[in-house]
């Protein structure tokens, strides 16, 4: 008998795509529904007048944001547990390997 895979819900993007003068940050996709064990992938793009760093955050319902990792220069790749992130000149991608039900949350990036 084939084991049924349970869907895992990950809500991505506070949809903050905030803008401040010339600075903009946009997220995609707005919603993910990967299966348990899959790789979830999300990205943010940005257009800023000055870049210092990019941070990825996770926020569970009813809780404050939790910092996941920081990245400082284009071409940078960082791994932390099941999280893997890449930083390009105008964007970043976050990957969660072996997705689990407890990964369900809102994920977003912020640029400083």
From Swiss-Prot:
It comes from the Eukaryota. SMART domains: IGv. Residues 22-112 form the Ig-like domain. Disulfide bonds join 44-109. Keywords: Adaptive immunity, Cell membrane, Disulfide bond, Glycoprotein, Immunity, Immunoglobulin domain, Membrane, Receptor, Signal, T cell receptor. Pfam families: V-set. Its main location: membrane. It is found in: Cell membrane. InterPro entries: Ig-like_dom (IPR007110), Ig-like_dom_sf (IPR036179), Ig-like_fold (IPR013783), Ig_V-set (IPR013106), TCR_alpha_variable (IPR051896). The keyword Glycoprotein applies. Residues 1-21 form the signal peptide. V region of the variable domain of T cell receptor (TR) alpha chain that participates in the antigen recognition. Alpha-beta T cell receptors are antigen specific receptors which are essential to the immune response and are present on the cell surface of T lymphocytes. Recognize peptide-major histocompatibility (MH) (pMH) complexes that are displayed by antigen presenting cells (APC), a prerequisite for efficient T cell adaptive immunity against pathogens. Alpha-beta TR is a heterodimer composed of an alpha and beta chain; disulfide-linked. The alpha-beta TR is associated with the transmembrane signaling CD3 coreceptor proteins to form the TR-CD3 (TcR or TCR). The assembly of alpha-beta TR heterodimers with CD3 occurs in the endoplasmic reticulum where a single alpha-beta TR heterodimer associates with one CD3D-CD3E heterodimer, one CD3G-CD3E heterodimer and one CD247 homodimer forming a stable octameric structure. CD3D-CD3E and CD3G-CD3E heterodimers preferentially associate with TR alpha and TR beta chains, respectively. This is T cell receptor alpha variable 7. It comes from Homo sapiens (Human). The lineage of its organism: Eukaryota, Metazoa, Chordata, Craniata, Vertebrata.
